């Protein structure tokens, strides 16, 4: 139906009118009616539908043949119907052709009715015509609607076909573009292959040079070592091959699974193709399904894109968080530095407090002999002790609260210093009273005892310092062990990374093979397209030939000759097809083999290059780690130097303070003798008051002991809290260090290729860093100045408080006017101390400048040393070149001898076996030569340990070269002896020459092939060697710097021990001198001068020692560098031999590994995902634990604050009670005279108790230090474990990223494969359609050959629809096939090969001619 509607044209009515048969025209209307709602023939009067024309004739005769009226009314009705039809034509202009055909059909029906029925009555005819016209109008309207709907459906079908055509065009364009891209890729690959061949040629030349170097004689001892290493390497390679075989088996299983899935998918594709071939109706359904699938695919791609965008956002957030984390870590480091400085300040204050405690002990020894002033001073001392204890607690709180209460702590420390000044003033007053009361001998003895106590204290301090040094040494050893462990772990991780990279490379090779297979498929598709085009051209040629044949047949020329020609052409074409297919198969197979060989070669070269790149990367990472360790060690050394300087300054300040005290004591002795007579009268009054005060003093001492016990408990709690805080801070620092290590590993992975270029820039950056450190130190100096200003402000505040206290203590001012003068002198001393501190700061700046100058000098020395090393390198290379030239001469002689031996070896098989044995002996001798070379290198390294004996070392090398020449001459003699033996064998075995010539030629060819392989491998070896030399030179340079720093540390420790021994000796001398102070005051000045001279000598000696050590370090660096070069040469040779064996085995197992590694990567991916989830859970649990610990610390801090407040309240209450008791006991001062003796005894016992308490405190401090050691050990272990965990996480992340990348690439390849499969399906469908068309053309060809002009008598029915011919149903011949049809089946006209004009044709022939 659709074809008929499409084939209707407005000009067809004219063509139909031109036909000879007038009865053929009504068929169009019949078709329209048949395809409308009614079926068959319709009666024009009653509009009844009938099955055939005979039935319509009978119906009309039986029903409507009532009478014959006049025809005038009918003619009028016809005119009316014509007017109505014209109106309908105007209303329906879009369907003019169909309306004309319907009108013409109605007129023809009327003519036939008039012929067979005659005239009827006019009235009946008029009524019948009116009804007929109305019925016809309704039928026409229905037909119009149907035609519109059919047009709409046809348009939809046309749009679908156009969409399909557009899709096919786009796919063809994509295929062509991919073909062009693959062509370009192939050209690039060919270029790469040419470059690789050039590189191989270069490497062959390099390998030949290396052969000349390797033919040098080694020592005998290194052969065993090399054998052991070879055995180890072979075992490792066996294990690797076993693992790779397992992986290949797994990959084969997966490949089989994939192939089965591929076969299943191909079966489903074939089913879909068969279903598509069933009919065009199902095409639309499949198209819709395809569109739905495409929509779902688009949705999935959008989801994937959204997920990738989310991942990218998360990655960006992660990077931001890492940056924030780095900033916080930097801020924490700055805070830690500031806390460290404040801790140092606190230590200085504690040192001052210890000095004040010693002065308090002296005051307690002298209290028993003082008067009323002593009571008030003791009360003030107790108040100072209580305030000092409060200040200690507050200092610890300040350490916890850090930034909030720093100012308050500084104010309290200022108050403590002022109170200590007052204590010193009171001590001087007590000393005056004590000097008046007692004789000079007692004073001297007591002072000697005090100095002995000071010496003991200093000895204790020295012992503590020695213990601390020992602890630091043990810590350093532990750190070294940890470093070694971490290095081992790092090496293991590098091995794992290398294995993972090898697996990934194998996977990449598999992917390249898959891509290559896809390219082959694309080429096949293109070939099929070319074949399709050729088939279309052949079809067009066949159609032209068919038309020629039709013309010949219609012209009446020989049909048999034409058929024979066609058969011969078909036979010839089939033979050509078979030949061409065989040629194509052969060419395709050869082409595939060539491509596979090229691909294998390219993959081998890529594997070699990637292995070399991995080694370079591993060496660069090791270099960077060593450099970081060097920097850390340098920082530690600088910190130790700073600590040592600070301690030496403290010792010097303590000695200066002692000298000042001695001068003060002498002045006091002189004044005390004069004041004794004046104060004897006052003693009687003071003695009474002392009796009363002793009782109070005992009670208060008991109270102080209780308070000290409480203080100890609080200190222990506070220490435990501090340890927890330090543990948490250490954990945080470790996490920060791990994060920094992760970032460093990322940056190292990204910048490993650019490190060699940036070596020059690194030096400039180091200079800039040094300048920044200087600026930071200047900032520290400015901070110290600000602290001094703050302290001056605190002093002013203290002065204000002093003025208030002076107003309250007017009575004391009258009695202690002398003390005020002493306080003024102390203020002056404080100002002097401030000035001394400023001078010390300037000295520190000068030291910094000196250090900078030393740095510049050391850099210049290093440059000079590097120049000298370069000169020595050039000399050594010249000597090596000379040795190489000698060895080349030897090799040439050996080669000539080998050629002679090969010519003579062709004579006999036995001679060949003897030659093989001799070759093995020569290999052994070559190994011995290598061993001798190594021994020579060892001798060279030993000779270079002393730079002064370089000339002697050169002479030794020349001697060894002479020995080598002698050994070469001995070898020549051996070869000549072998030649003699060979000649004897030739004379005996001339019979077997003909047979063995062929075998020897084959062996020579094999040897040449092996030599080519060796040359290719050695070229790779030389490139790797050059890279390794550069990297290892950097490594050994940094190792030499490390050794120098360690030696400097050792020298510093030795200096410390010497200084300590000097200090101990000086202190012993001071103790001996103190016993004879009165007798040797005159000799004191001379001894001090001697000590000053000794110190100057010590400084000069220390400078000389430093210079000598620097020279030693420079020389040792040079020796280490030369040793490293020799060791590098040996290691490089061993590595290259190992790499040759590895490469030979890797070439065999490369194809198997690629399949195994994909399965391993998938398993590893799943394991890593699981481990990632577990680690995330652990991290969450750790975070929760951290939060709990923080909350517990806050609660503990609040409790400590509450307890402190309670104690302050108790202390205030007790102070009030003490004041009340003092007022009560002032009345009973007279009784104090009797209890003087008792008090003196009690004071001595108290001093002993204080000594025991100090010893206990020292033992507790030792315990604390031991516990701190244990905690440090535990922290180190925790740090190691956390570092391993972090490294594992980093490795897992890297593997996950690689897996994700691999999955993305696999998905891309899968999409490409699906697209290619679709294209294959389309091409196969097109080929099938072409085959069908060819079959249909062959059928039509046979039909055309069998066609005959049918006769009217033989055919009674239509040959298409089967209608019986009658008067109404007439016969019509098809001008194409010659068969007879009815008018309905032969309505169409078309051009045929036998006619120039359009001729009546049946529907089938019309479709054939038009299609």
UniProtKB/Swiss-Prot annotation:
<keyword id="KW-0862">Zinc</keyword>
<comment type="subunit">
    <text>Homodimer. Binds STX6. Binds RAB5A, RAB5B, RAB5C and RAB22A that have been activated by GTP-binding. Interacts with ERBB2. Interacts with RAB31. Interacts with SAMD9 and SAMD9L. May interact with PLEKHF2.</text>
</comment>
<dbReference type="GO" id="GO:0030742">
    <property type="term" value="F:GTP-dependent protein binding"/>
</dbReference>
<dbReference type="GO" id="GO:0044788">
    <property type="term" value="P:modulation by host of viral process"/>
</dbReference>
<feature type="binding site">
    <location>
        <position position="1358"/>
    </location>
    <ligand>
        <name>Zn(2+) 1</name>
    </ligand>
</feature>
<keyword id="KW-0472">Membrane</keyword>
<feature type="binding site">
    <location>
        <position position="1374"/>
    </location>
    <ligand>
        <name>Zn(2+) 2</name>
    </ligand>
</feature>
<dbReference type="GO" id="GO:0005545">
    <property type="term" value="F:1-phosphatidylinositol binding"/>
</dbReference>
<comment type="function">
    <text>Binds phospholipid vesicles containing phosphatidylinositol 3-phosphate and participates in endosomal trafficking.</text>
</comment>
<feature type="binding site">
    <location>
        <position position="1361"/>
    </location>
    <ligand>
        <name>Zn(2+) 1</name>
    </ligand>
</feature>
<feature type="binding site">
    <location>
        <position position="1405"/>
    </location>
    <ligand>
        <name>Zn(2+) 2</name>
    </ligand>
</feature>
<dbReference type="GO" id="GO:0055037">
    <property type="term" value="C:recycling endosome"/>
</dbReference>
<feature type="compositionally biased region" description="Basic and acidic residues">
    <location>
        <begin position="481"/>
        <end position="490"/>
    </location>
</feature>
<dbReference type="GO" id="GO:0006897">
    <property type="term" value="P:endocytosis"/>
</dbReference>
<feature type="zinc finger region" description="C2H2-type">
    <location>
        <begin position="41"/>
        <end position="64"/>
    </location>
</feature>
<dbReference type="GO" id="GO:0042803">
    <property type="term" value="F:protein homodimerization activity"/>
</dbReference>
<feature type="region of interest" description="Disordered">
    <location>
        <begin position="1189"/>
        <end position="1217"/>
    </location>
</feature>
<feature type="modified residue" description="Phosphoserine">
    <location>
        <position position="52"/>
    </location>
</feature>
<feature type="modified residue" description="Phosphoserine">
    <location>
        <position position="70"/>
    </location>
</feature>
<dbReference type="InterPro" id="IPR013083">
    <property type="entry name" value="Znf_RING/FYVE/PHD"/>
</dbReference>
<dbReference type="GO" id="GO:0098685">
    <property type="term" value="C:Schaffer collateral - CA1 synapse"/>
</dbReference>
<dbReference type="GO" id="GO:0099565">
    <property type="term" value="P:chemical synaptic transmission, postsynaptic"/>
</dbReference>
<feature type="binding site">
    <location>
        <position position="1402"/>
    </location>
    <ligand>
        <name>Zn(2+) 2</name>
    </ligand>
</feature>
<feature type="binding site">
    <location>
        <position position="1377"/>
    </location>
    <ligand>
        <name>Zn(2+) 2</name>
    </ligand>
</feature>
<keyword id="KW-0863">Zinc-finger</keyword>
<keyword id="KW-0597">Phosphoprotein</keyword>
<dbReference type="GO" id="GO:0098830">
    <property type="term" value="C:presynaptic endosome"/>
</dbReference>
<dbReference type="InterPro" id="IPR000306">
    <property type="entry name" value="Znf_FYVE"/>
</dbReference>
<keyword id="KW-0967">Endosome</keyword>
<dbReference type="GO" id="GO:0098978">
    <property type="term" value="C:glutamatergic synapse"/>
</dbReference>
<protein>
    <recommendedName>
        <fullName>Early endosome antigen 1</fullName>
    </recommendedName>
</protein>
<dbReference type="Pfam" id="PF01363">
    <property type="entry name" value="FYVE"/>
</dbReference>
<dbReference type="GO" id="GO:0044308">
    <property type="term" value="C:axonal spine"/>
</dbReference>
<dbReference type="InterPro" id="IPR017455">
    <property type="entry name" value="Znf_FYVE-rel"/>
</dbReference>
<dbReference type="GO" id="GO:0031901">
    <property type="term" value="C:early endosome membrane"/>
</dbReference>
<dbReference type="GO" id="GO:0005768">
    <property type="term" value="C:endosome"/>
</dbReference>
<dbReference type="GO" id="GO:0008270">
    <property type="term" value="F:zinc ion binding"/>
</dbReference>
<feature type="zinc finger region" description="FYVE-type">
    <location>
        <begin position="1352"/>
        <end position="1410"/>
    </location>
</feature>
<feature type="compositionally biased region" description="Low complexity">
    <location>
        <begin position="491"/>
        <end position="500"/>
    </location>
</feature>
<dbReference type="GO" id="GO:0098842">
    <property type="term" value="C:postsynaptic early endosome"/>
</dbReference>
<feature type="binding site">
    <location>
        <position position="1385"/>
    </location>
    <ligand>
        <name>Zn(2+) 1</name>
    </ligand>
</feature>
<dbReference type="GO" id="GO:0005769">
    <property type="term" value="C:early endosome"/>
</dbReference>
């Amino acid at each position: 139906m659709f074809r008929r509607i499409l084939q209707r044209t407005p000009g067809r009515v004219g063509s139909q009118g031109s036909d000879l048969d007038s009865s053929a025209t009504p068929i169009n209307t019949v078709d329209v009616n048949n395809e409308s709602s009614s079926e068959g023939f319709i009666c024009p009067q009653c509009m009844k539908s009938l099955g055939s024309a005979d039935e319509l004739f009978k119906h009309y005769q039986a029903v409507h043949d009532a009478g014959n009226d006049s025809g005038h009314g009918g003619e009028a009705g016809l005119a009316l119907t014509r007017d109505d039809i014209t109106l309908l034509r105007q209303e329906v202009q879009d369907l003019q052709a169909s309306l004309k055909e319907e009108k013409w059909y109605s007129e023809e029906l009327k003519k036939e009715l008039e012929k067979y029925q005659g005239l009827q009555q006019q009235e009946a005819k008029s009524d019948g015509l009116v009804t007929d016209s109305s019925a016809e109008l309704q039928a026409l309207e229905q037909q119009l609607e149907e035609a519109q709907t059919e047009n709409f459906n046809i348009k939809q079908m046309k749009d679908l076909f156009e969409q399909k055509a557009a899709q096919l065009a786009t796919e063809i364009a994509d295929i062509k573009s991919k073909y062009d891209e693959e062509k370009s890729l192939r050209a690039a690959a060919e270029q790469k292959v040419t470059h690789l061949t050039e590189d191989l040629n270069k490497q062959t030349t390099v390998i030949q040079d290396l052969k000349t170097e390797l033919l040098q004689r080694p020592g005998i001892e290194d052969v065993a070592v090399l054998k052991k290493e070879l055995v180890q390497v072979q075992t490792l390679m066996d294990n690797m091959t076993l693992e790779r075989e397992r992986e290949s088996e797994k990959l084969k299983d997966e490949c089989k699974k994939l192939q089965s899935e591929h076969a299943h998918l191909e079966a489903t594709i074939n089913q879909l193709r068969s279903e598509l071939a069933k009919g065009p109706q199902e095409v639309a359904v499949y198209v819709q399904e395809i569109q739905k699938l495409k929509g779902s695919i688009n949705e999935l791609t959008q989801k994937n894109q959204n997920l990738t965008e989310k991942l990218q956002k998360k990655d960006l957030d992660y990077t931001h968080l890492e940056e924030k984390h780095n900033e916080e870590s930097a801020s924490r480091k700055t805070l830690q530095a500031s806390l460290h400085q404040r801790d140092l300040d606190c230590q200085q204050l504690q040192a001052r407090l210890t000095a004040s405690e010693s002065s308090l002990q002296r005051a307690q020894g002298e209290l028993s002999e003082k008067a009323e002033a002593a009571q008030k001073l003791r009360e003030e001392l107790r108040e100072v002790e209580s305030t000092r204890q409060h200040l200690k607690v507050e200092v610890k709180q300040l350490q916890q609260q850090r930034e909030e209460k720093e100012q308050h702590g500084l104010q309290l420390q200022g108050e403590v210093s002022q109170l200590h000044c007052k204590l010193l003033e009171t001590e001087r007053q007590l000393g005056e009273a004590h000097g008046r009361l007692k004789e000079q001998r007692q004073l001297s003895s007591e002072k000697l005892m005090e100095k002995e106590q000071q010496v003991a204290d200093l000895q204790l301090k020295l012992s503590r310092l020695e213990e601390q040094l020992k602890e630091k040494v043990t810590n350093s050893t532990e750190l070294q062990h940890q470093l070694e462990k971490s290095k081992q772990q790092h090496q293991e991780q590098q091995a794992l990374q290398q294995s993972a990279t090898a697996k990934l490379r194998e996977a990449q090779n598999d992917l390249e093979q898959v891509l290559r297979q896809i390219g082959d498929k694309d080429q096949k598709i293109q070939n099929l397209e070319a074949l399709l085009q050729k088939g279309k051209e052949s079809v067009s040629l066949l159609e032209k030939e068919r038309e020629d044949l039709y013309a010949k047949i219609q012209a009446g020329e020989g049909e048999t000759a034409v058929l024979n020609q066609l058969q011969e052409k078909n036979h010839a074409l089939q033979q050509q097809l078979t030949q061409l297919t065989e040629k194509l198969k052969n060419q395709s197979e050869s082409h595939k083999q060539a491509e596979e060989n090229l691909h294998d070669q390219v993959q081998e070269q890529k594997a070699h290059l990637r292995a070399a790149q991995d080694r370079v990367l591993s060496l660069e990472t090791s270099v960077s780690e060593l450099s970081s360790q060097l920097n850390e060690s340098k920082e530690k050394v600088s910190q130790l130097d700073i600590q040592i300087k600070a301690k030496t300054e403290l010792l010097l300040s303590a000695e200066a303070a002692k000298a000042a005290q001695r001068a003060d004591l002498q002045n006091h002795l002189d004044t005390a003798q004069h004041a004794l007579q004046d104060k004897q009268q006052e003693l009687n009054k003071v003695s009474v008051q002392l009796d009363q005060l002793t009782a109070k003093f005992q009670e208060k001492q008991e109270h102080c002991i209780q308070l000290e016990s409480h203080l100890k408990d609080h200190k222990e709690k506070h220490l435990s809290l501090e340890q927890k805080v330090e543990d948490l801070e250490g954990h945080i620092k470790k996490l920060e260090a791990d994060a920094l290590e992760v970032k460093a590993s990322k940056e190292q992975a990204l910048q490993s290729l650019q490190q060699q270029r940036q070596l020059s820039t690194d030096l400039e950056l180091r200079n800039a860093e040094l300048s920044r450190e200087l600026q930071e130190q200047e900032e520290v100096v400015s901070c110290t100045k600000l602290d001094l200003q703050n302290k001056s402000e605190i002093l002013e505040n203290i002065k204000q408080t002093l003025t208030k206290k002076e107003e309250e203590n007017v009575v004391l001012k009258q009695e202690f006017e002398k003390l005020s003068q002493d306080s003024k002198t102390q203020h002056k001393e404080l100002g002097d101390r401030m000035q001394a501190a400023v001078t010390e700061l300037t000295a520190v700046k000068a030291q910094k400048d000196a250090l900078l100058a030393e740095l510049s000098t050391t850099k210049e020395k290093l440059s000079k040393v590097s120049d000298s090393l370069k000169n020595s390198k050039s000399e050594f290379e010249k000597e090596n070149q000379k040795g190489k030239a000698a060895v080349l001469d030897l090799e040439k002689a050996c080669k000539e001898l080998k050629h002679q031996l090969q010519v003579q070896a062709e004579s006999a098989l036995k001679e060949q076996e003897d030659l093989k044995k001799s070759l093995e002996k020569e290999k052994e001798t070559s190994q011995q030569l290598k061993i001798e070379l190594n021994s020579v290198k060892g001798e060279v390294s030993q000779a270079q340990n002393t730079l002064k004996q370089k000339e002697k070392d050169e002479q030794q090398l020349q001697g060894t070269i002479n020995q080598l020449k002698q050994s070469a001459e001995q070898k020549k003699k051996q070869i000549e002896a072998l030649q003699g033996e060979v000649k004897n064998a030739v004379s005996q075995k001339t019979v077997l020459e003909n047979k063995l010539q062929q075998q020897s030629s084959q062996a020579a060819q094999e040897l040449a092939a092996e030599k080519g392989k060796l040359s290719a491998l050695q070229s790779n070896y030389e490139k790797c060697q050059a890279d390794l030399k550069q990297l290892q030179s950097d490594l050994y340079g940094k190792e030499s710097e490390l050794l120098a720093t360690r030696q400097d540390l050792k020298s510093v420790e030795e200096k410390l021990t010497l200084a300590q021994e000097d200090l101990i000796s000086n202190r012993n001398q001071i103790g001996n001198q103190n016993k004879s102070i009165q007798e040797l005051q005159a000799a004191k000045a001379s001894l001090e001068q001697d000590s000053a001279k000794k110190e100057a000598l010590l400084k000069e000696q220390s400078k000389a020692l430093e210079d000598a050590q620097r020279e030693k370090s420079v020389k040792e660096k040079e020796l280490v560098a030369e040793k490293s070069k020799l060791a590098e040469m040996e290691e490089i040779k061993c590595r290259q031999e190992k790499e040759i064996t590895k490469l030979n085995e890797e070439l065999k197992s490369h194809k198997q590994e690629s399949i195994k590694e994909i399965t391993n990567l998938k398993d590893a991916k799943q394991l890593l995902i699981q481990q990632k989830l577990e680690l995330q859970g652990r991290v969450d649990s750790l975070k929760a634990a951290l939060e709990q610990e923080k909350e517990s610390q806050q609660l503990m801090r609040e409790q400590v604050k509450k307890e402190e407040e309670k104690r302050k309240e108790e202390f205030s209450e007790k102070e009030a009670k003490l004041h009340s008791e003092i007022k009560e006991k002032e009345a009973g001062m007279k009784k104090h005279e009797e209890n003087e003796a008792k008090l003196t005894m009690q004071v001595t016992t108290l001093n002993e108790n204080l000594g025991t308490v100090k010893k206990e405190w020292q033992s507790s401090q030792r315990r604390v230090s031991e516990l701190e050691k244990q905690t440090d050990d535990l922290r180190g272990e925790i740090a190691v474990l956390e570092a391993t965990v972090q490294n594992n996480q980093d490795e897992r992340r890297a593997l996950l990223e690689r897996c994700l990348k691999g999955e993305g690439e696999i998905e891309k390849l899968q999409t490409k494969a699906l697209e290619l499969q679709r294209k294959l399906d389309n091409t196969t469908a097109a080929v099938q359609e072409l085959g069908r068309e060819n079959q249909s053309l062959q059928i039509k060809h046979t039909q055309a050959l069998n066609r005959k002009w049918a006769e009217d008598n033989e055919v009674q029915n239509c040959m298409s629809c089967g209608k019986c011919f009658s008067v109404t149903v007439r016969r019509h011949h098809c001008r194409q096939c010659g068969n007879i049809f009815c008018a309905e089946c032969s309505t169409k006209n078309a051009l045929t090969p036998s006619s120039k004009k359009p001729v009546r044709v049946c529907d089938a022939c019309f479709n054939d001619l038009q299609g």
